[in-house]
Design a protein with these regions (language model features):
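N-terminal glycine-rich flavin-associated loop
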Residues: 15-62, 70, 74-106, 142-150
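ATP-binding N-lobe of GHMP and related small-molecule kinases
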Residues: 67
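Short acidic, glycine/serine/threonine-rich loops at helix termini
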Residues: 3-8, 75, 106-107, 133
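A glycine-rich beta-to-alpha transition motif near the start of alpha/beta enzyme domains, typified by
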Residues: 10-14
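C-terminal substrate-binding/cap subdomain adjacent to the FAD-binding core in PCMH-type
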Residues: 90-192
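Active-site beta-strand/loop segments that form the cofactor-binding cradle
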Residues: 1-7, 18, 36
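Short loop/helix-cap segments at secondary-structure boundaries that form the rim of catalytic
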Residues: 3-7, 23-24, 43-44, 192
């Protein structure tokens, strides 16, 4: 992620060989995955069960990994509606600078055992520890999604999005570029 801030010097630690889904219980909405696993592989496995990563990790390359997505903390266009990547981290297994294999959090939605250290590593770019496994909360895919496109300038787009945000609309993402506002609606067919 050199494009994001100052490029770092040093050796790259490649974890792409440390891949695979460790545990996935669709009924519990939890997936534990090794961090070298590609985002595409995780999304495919979830889609087969009608589920998704709600934070929609951006894909900067076809072989982007879950470890990269969580380590960078990047979230996609659904962030405003669903939450950020760190909001979906239930637990992590990491290697610290001393080489210790540590686990924080767990595989349950409610974790009230003090500080949520598993979320600290989300967005830390590997500066706190090397993430080796992550347990993620996943969500059911919406029944239907559609994107509306409006021609409007910056000020009108900001005003429209702010107005719509205060209404009970199933908006899951917005994007404005080159005089066009894209509004994605997600949910039940009747609502969309």
């Amino acid at each position: 992620k050199d494009f994001y801030g100052v490029a770092l010097e040093g050796d790259v630690l490649d974890t792409t060989g440390h891949r695979g889904i460790v545990d996935y219980d669709p009924s519990e909405l939890v997936m534990t995955v090794r961090t070298g696993t590609s985002v595409a592989e995780v999304e495919t496995a979830l889609a087969e069960r009608g589920q998704m990563l709600a934070f929609e990790p951006p894909r900067f390359s076809p072989d982007g990994t879950i470890g990269g997505a969580i380590g960078s903390g990047f979230s996609g266009p659904r962030r405003a509606a669903a939450g950020s990547a760190r909001d979906f981290v239930l637990g992590v297994r990491v290697l610290d600078a001393a080489g210790r294999d540590l686990s924080f959090g767990g595989q349950v939605m409610k974790n009230v055992a003090g500080y949520d250290l598993s979320r600290f590593v989300a967005g830390s770019f590997g500066t706190l520890a090397l993430i080796t496994e992550v347990s993620l909360k996943v969500l059911p895919k919406p029944e239907v999604e559609t994107t509306l496109v409006f021609d409007m300038g910056d000020a009108a787009a900001i005003e429209a999005v702010n107005r719509w945000a205060g209404q009970p609309l199933p908006i899951s993402a917005t994007f404005h570029a080159e005089g066009r506002l894209f509004v994605r609606l997600s949910g039940a067919t009747a609502a969309v």
